[in-house]
């Protein structure tokens, strides 16, 4: 009996059938063990976006539609990403994207664009968005039956079609029934279980939310979203630090790139006095933060590392780590400053220090103070104070609130009160902090009392601090210190011990422990020596981390470039004008851990393509704009598995260069940045990422001579020939600038243009529209062709004009589009005019010449506005 026949409620069978009819992830359940020799069976290859089913080249109509689809998409991308595009603009863009996709259904980019724009218009036109989304998902499923993202989207789309939450819950439960799990595959089942958990949470079913969240983690522990959610949720319900370690270890293993999870794990370990494990964790967290270029977290984790070493009695190692890392961080900080202000002198630059978290400043100063190195202590104090000055200046430059600025002034005051020698500036600092709103009356009283303590007024300080110390660790530390000054040593020992026991793993707790060791004359006193319960708790946490956080993760972090193997290969390295080609991007999981693919995963769901090519007439390569490319066709890669994504080059910046400058010869270098760091804008690799180059690609270009022109004038008359269409486009580029024509035939330019116009008119409208989309900017020589194009009544040609050539909001062709009788085209014309108008105003505002521009710029009397 079929699986779906056993379901006893309506409306779900179709969803289950959809889940089971879609091809499962064959390799997800059969990944080889780490010690098993790898074979090519682990390869997961996506269906190429250029059809590969036939060895024959596409026929004329198929190929010209592919070319026109790509030409429209090339201009639709920037149009739909314009900052001022309206809701109607998104709707018009969706309609055009659907046309592009239907013209070339065997190519993926247009369908991806349909999905993107369907999400944008869903709020305003939900029915149209839903229909477009379903059509796109169905087409993508045919192109690549193993596309996990598409499979899940189709299932979610079918489930969301149910009218009630209860019906959607039953649909999820049917899909996730035990008999269906094998067909779904563990990664897909985990994500569906998480979606069901989220639905139960919205309904208010806490128990079922817990159940399905646990199911999601159980099905696929490498699914980062579920692992992180489980760590956050279940930690709130168990008062057990060892359980916290287990949950957070699963989340870290699922996504070591998530720095917030590292921070949470470190907090649990330090709070529990598990300094050995905290040291291991902090070193890994620093490596990830450095790779992700998150300097603010590098500072924070460096403070945690110093605290872990300090807490375990490794004072010398802590001092060494701080010196090593802070020197490097200071160099990086000064390098950035010198880039931002090239005029800065070396003397001024030497006085610049990075802003540091207060915990890191206290750790550095506390360790140096205990060591008795006065010179080093003074240097570190200056560094800490200059760092707070830098933080204040940054906050003021960014227009932060006065309270935010006040918080940084307060950090400076705390540093001075704990370690400073000259306290003359503290009263004014505290007054400024109060005025900023960052400090209330009770806080002001505490700091006034601390100032009295540092000024030698122990009795005054003790009287003011005594009622505050119960709930204020800093006040208690100052109170204990004042007790020492008042020669009340036994009471001071009690207070310092209390702070050390209740604030284990914090800079303040370790400062108190150092003071306690001095008072007890025990040179090396560590927290576990204070009580057996502290020692036992630390051992439990150390054991828990060793058990649940595998050493394979240490291996990955120590050698991140070995975890992912990336290869980039073009389909050809010799490309002629308007020739179609592809890039193959292969990524292999070479580690011993499964890795998810996605936006918040160990393997990013996108890579960045970087490319460079010399400008015409120059030899030095110029960087082309970086371009993100989606690769999230799979949910995860098991050890030894790889994914191969084929990308159509004509919609990359490299392919667009070929279209814009088809006559020129280019030697193009291409590389792919995997796991691009968000801190670098995606242009540099983050953790586990790399920059992988492809073999250089030679664009052959065209040598425009008399023989080539003669041959072209004959060839463009050939009917039903792609070569005739592309040669016509090349001839237009050559004839658009008379200087490009051989001197011997420049007198024939009118006849050449007559041939061009005749050939263009004789071509089918799809070819006409494509040529219109790839023509160069309008020149006087092009007037005959431009006039012929303007007189066309073909809606296909008019669409090409609207999306590829209009930059002037007053272009008369927009009215022609509106009068065409095609409502969809009229809507596109309105949207293009809106965006063109906003772009022209932005351009005027940027140079501050809007009024002058309106007064002096002549009206456009040319044949067309150009691209």
What is the meaning of each model-derived region?
Residues 90-99, 127-143, 166-180, 206-217, ...:
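Alpha-helical repeat scaffolds
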Residues 614-658:
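Intrinsically disordered, low-complexity Pro/Gly/Ser/Thr-rich segments with frequent PxxP/GP/PP motifs
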Residues 116, 156-157, 198, 232-233, ...:
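Residue-level recognition of tetratricopeptide repeat
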Residues 517-577:
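Low-complexity, acidic Ser/Thr/Pro/Gly-rich terminal tails and inter-domain linkers that flank the onset
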Residues 87, 121-123, 161-162, 203, ...:
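Structural motif corresponding to the intra-repeat A-B loop/turn of tetratricopeptide repeats
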Residues 60-77, 89-90, 104-113, 129-130, ...:
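Generic helix N-cap/helix-start motif at coil->alpha-helix transitions
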Residues 26-131, 135, 143-153:
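N-terminal leader/linker segments that initiate helical-solenoid repeat arrays
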Residues 677-722:
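Short beta-strand elements
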């Amino acid at each position: 009996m079929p699986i779906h026949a056993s379901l006893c409620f309506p409306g779900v069978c179709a969803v289950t059938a959809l889940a089971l009819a879609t091809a499962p992830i064959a390799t997800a359940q059969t990944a080889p063990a780490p010690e098993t020799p790898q074979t090519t069976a682990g390869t997961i290859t996506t269906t190429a976006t250029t059809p590969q089913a036939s060895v024959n080249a596409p026929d004329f109509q198929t190929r010209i539609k592919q070319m026109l689809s790509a030409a429209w998409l090339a201009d639709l991308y920037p149009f739909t990403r314009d900052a001022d595009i309206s809701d109607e603009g998104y709707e018009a863009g969706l309609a055009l994207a659907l046309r592009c996709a239907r013209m070339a259904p065997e190519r993926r980019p247009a369908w991806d664009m349909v999905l993107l724009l369907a999400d944008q218009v869903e709020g305003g036109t939900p029915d149209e968005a839903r229909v477009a989304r379903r059509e796109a998902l169905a087409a993508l499923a045919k192109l690549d039956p193993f596309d996990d993202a598409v499979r899940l989207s189709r299932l979610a789309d079918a489930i969301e079609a149910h009218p009630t939450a209860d019906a959607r819950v039953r649909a999820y439960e049917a899909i996730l029934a035990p008999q269906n799990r094998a067909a779904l595959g563990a990664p897909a089942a985990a994500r569906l279980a998480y979606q069901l958990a989220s639905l139960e949470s919205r309904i208010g079913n806490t128990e079922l939310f817990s159940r399905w969240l646990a199911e999601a983690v159980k099905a696929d522990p490498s699914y980062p979203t579920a692992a992180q959610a489980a760590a956050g949720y279940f930690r709130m319900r168990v008062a057990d630090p060892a359980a916290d370690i287990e949950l957070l270890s699963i989340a870290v293993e699922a996504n070591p790139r998530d720095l917030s999870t590292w921070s949470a794990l470190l907090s649990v370990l330090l709070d529990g006095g598990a300094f050995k494990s905290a040291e291991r964790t902090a070193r890994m967290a620093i490596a990830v933060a450095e790779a992700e270029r998150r300097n603010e977290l590098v500072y924070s984790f460096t403070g945690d590392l110093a605290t872990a070493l300090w807490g375990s009695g490794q004072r010398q190692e802590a001092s060494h780590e701080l010196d090593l890392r802070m020197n490097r961080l200071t160099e990086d900080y000064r390098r950035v400053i010198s880039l931002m202000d090239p005029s800065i002198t070396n003397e001024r630059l030497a006085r610049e220090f990075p802003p540091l978290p207060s915990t890191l400043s206290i750790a550095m100063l506390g360790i140096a103070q205990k060591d008795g190195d006065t010179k080093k202590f003074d240097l570190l104090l200056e560094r800490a104070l200059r760092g707070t000055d830098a933080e204040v200046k940054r906050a003021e430059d960014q227009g932060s609130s006065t309270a935010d600025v006040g918080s940084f002034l307060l950090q400076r005051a705390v540093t001075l009160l704990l370690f400073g020698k000259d306290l003359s500036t503290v009263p004014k600092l505290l007054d400024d902090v109060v005025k900023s709103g960052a400090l209330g009356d009770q806080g002001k009283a505490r700091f006034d009392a601390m100032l009295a303590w540092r000024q030698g007024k122990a009795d005054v300080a003790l009287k003011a601090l005594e009622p505050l110390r119960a709930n204020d660790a800093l006040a208690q530390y100052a109170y204990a210190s004042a007790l020492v000054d008042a020669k009340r040593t036994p009471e001071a020992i009690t207070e310092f011990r209390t702070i050390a026991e209740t604030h284990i793993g914090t800079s303040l707790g370790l400062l108190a422990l150092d003071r306690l060791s001095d008072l007890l004359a025990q040179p090396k006193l560590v927290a576990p020596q204070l009580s057996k319960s502290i020692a036992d708790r630390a051992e439990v946490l150390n054991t828990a981390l060793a058990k649940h956080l595998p050493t394979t993760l240490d291996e990955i972090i120590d050698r991140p470039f070995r975890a992912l193997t990336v290869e980039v290969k073009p389909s050809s390295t010799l490309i002629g004008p308007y020739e179609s080609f592809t890039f193959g991007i292969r990524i292999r999981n070479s580690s011993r851990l499964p890795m998810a693919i996605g936006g918040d995963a160990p393997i990013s769901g996108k890579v960045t393509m970087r490319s460079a090519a010399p400008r015409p007439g120059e030899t030095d390569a110029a960087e082309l704009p970086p371009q993100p490319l989606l690769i999230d066709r799979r949910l995860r890669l098991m050890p030894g598995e790889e994914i191969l994504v084929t990308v159509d080059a004509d919609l990359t910046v490299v392919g667009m260069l070929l279209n814009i400058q088809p006559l020129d010869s280019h030697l193009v270098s291409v590389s792919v940045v995997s796991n691009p760091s968000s801190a670098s804008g995606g242009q540099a690799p983050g953790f586990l990422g790399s920059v992988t180059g492809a073999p250089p690609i030679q664009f052959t270009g065209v040598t425009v001579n008399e023989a080539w022109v003669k041959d072209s004038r004959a060839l463009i008359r050939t009917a039903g020939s792609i070569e005739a269409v592309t040669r016509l486009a090349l001839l237009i580029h050559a004839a658009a600038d008379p200087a490009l024509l051989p001197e011997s035939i420049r007198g024939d330019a009118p006849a050449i243009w007559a041939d061009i116009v005749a050939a263009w008119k004789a071509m089918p409208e799809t070819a006409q529209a494509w040529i219109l989309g790839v023509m160069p900017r309008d020149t006087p020589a092009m007037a005959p062709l431009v006039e012929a194009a303007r007189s066309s009544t073909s809606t296909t040609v008019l669409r090409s004009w609207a999306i590829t050539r209009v930059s002037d909001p007053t272009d008369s062709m927009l009215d022609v589009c509106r009068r065409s009788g095609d409502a969809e085209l009229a809507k596109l014309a309105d949207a293009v005019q809106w965006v063109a108008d906003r772009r022209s105003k932005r351009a005027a505002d940027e140079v501050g010449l809007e009024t002058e521009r309106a007064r002096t710029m002549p009206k456009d009397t040319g044949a067309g506005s150009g691209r």
